[in-house]
Amino acid sequence: MSVCILAFPCEFPHNMLRTRFCTFLVLSTAALNSCAPAPTSTQTSASITVRNDVVFTPKNWPTAQLADLYLPTSTKSAPAVLLIHGGGWSGKERRADMTGIARSLAKRGYFVMNATYRLTPEWKFPAQRDDLEQAIRFMRSNAKEFNIDTSRLATFDYSAGGHLAALIGLDPANGVKAIVAGGAPSDLAFWPDGKLTGQLLGGPVKGNEKIYHEASPVHDVTTNSPPVFIYHGTDDDLVPLEHPNAFIATLRKHGVEHEVYWIEGRSHVLAHLFSGRAIPEAINFLDKHL
């Protein structure tokens, strides 16, 4: 089954807009790339508890990766969502644009893990995938402590994060039950000589066909793939419509349940800054499938 929604975006409340405007600045300047992590801390509100800067990779991992954990106050076993920040696989601090989404999910009763991963150009693929698979393992191995229902896991994010969310979610070994991928590249070979894809994959498509195929989620779809929620700006200038269209066509071909939320008239950045009801609809989608 597939559902298509065409939306004219509205603005977010001021605090969310401010958070998402920071995302635009980071995309433009990569100013937060070198920021050191803050000391580990725990914050508690009436409805959620947040544990910042939790190391989730093993001690012998190439570089320690951190996550902020959002725990709902409910005593019931909670479904879990892995948030994966964007930034062209090369930048962005995870809190720049994911804190609002993380809090919304946690208030809805989800355990949320907002995780980092190794960045290009220093680290080539599959380092990013390997890090995020460790995040999945962390949730499974700590399910009792954090009251996680590991049979209900999802991946979620936008742009490069959406690409990684799809890649992680479509691997059956990770046991993901739902995917949210916004503004996400689906076939990296659509950029045969792209700078960012070249940094990620070690060069252009020519001579690197195998790794481009391996890093493109469109090739991982099967009849057993989990449901997918896609949202994308109709005027996306960075991740052209051939990406969501190819992904949608492949999902349809294999009979995978999916919903599509088109954000009318928005570019890549503006669809992220002003996403209309894309995020609430994505959370509704998770409610149905987790």
Question: What is each of the regions a protein language model found here?
Answer:
Residues Q134-D193:
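Primarily recognizes the serine-hydrolase "nucleophile elbow" in alpha/beta-hydrolase
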Residues I230-H232, D236:
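Short beta-strand/loop motif that positions the catalytic acidic residue
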